Amino acid sequence: MSALRAVFLLAALALTAAPVHAQQSQQSLRMWFIDMEGGGATLFVSPTGETLLVDTGNGGQNATRDANRILDAMRDAGVTRIDHLVTTHWHGDHYGAMREVAGRVPIAHFIDHGPTVETAQAAVDFLRDVYPTLYQGARHTVAQPGDRIDVRGLDITVMTSAKRVTDRPVQGGGAANPYCAGFTPQEEDMGENAQSVGIHVRFGEFRLLHLGDLTVNTEYELMCPNNPIGSVDLWVVSHHGQPISNAAVLVHAIEPRVAIMNNGTRKGGQPAAMQVIHSAPGLEDLWQLHFSQLSGQEYTVPGVFIANGLDEQLEAMPIAPITPPTGRGGPPAPAHNGQAYWIEVSARPDGSFTVTNARNGFTKEYR
């Protein structure tokens, strides 16, 4: 083969290979579950390259750290703007780094449940003085149950907002929920958690549910007497894996194949919630952003499914779960401010998907 012919052959191969790679990317819904140390931030990138960010992590002294982690995930995704930002509720671990993120990348559409129902001064000040300046010149939507979020190639439905639930089932939902009869209500939650904007995402045959920090009584209102969701492939564990959320009336009814928990080193993963999660019908795996001291080895998952450790690694993780300290006098949670790793998901229209732990490269395929 002449040198000139070889050059032309290599060029032809390059031209034919590029569209194949682009086509594979266009056929996947990609998601980054970002470590917010027990806060929330999940980045969705649609097959058309549109972006949806759910929550923006912690504020205060951790705002810059969490904004940097969100921007790192965006760089990994190859995106430079947020088309839609959903703030599930007005707690500082879910909206805290919004100003820092908005100062570094454009955000086209801000979505929330409306005003805060709490009196925390930080949230009141943010909503009065900062938030309007961020969505000025952009779109701002107060979400209503049943609303659709317009992302090409995806069907995104608002299931809950402002403590109200949808009365219209998504495709595959609507059957009677057999777990309603066994539900035990908790004390009524009049705070922000129950106000959470919750969404259902459908991409072909793939289905995901993300309900923010929705608490058990509103889970019941959503799921009973009929299950409007049906089953899901991927479930974002509610409220970081805390037992004031994650009732069996939700978790067992939706029969998730895989769950991802955005917990912290000592936030979420309590035994009562973990028992419900681990016993969910059809659950293949639970992935965690952290080992939780509140789970201990008794309730946690094998290390390959855990994305992050501690700044000062313990010689041995405790077997028994610990009881979370009460009040403000307890010792601080184990620190993790160094390298943070996300859990990445790539879903395909046939319902199959891949989950990857960025810390160790462990990947598992679900078909």
Where are the regions a protein language model picked out?
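Non-globular, low-confidence helical/coil segments that flank catalytic cores
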Residues: 21-367
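N-terminal secretory signal peptides that target proteins for export/translocation
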Residues: 1-3
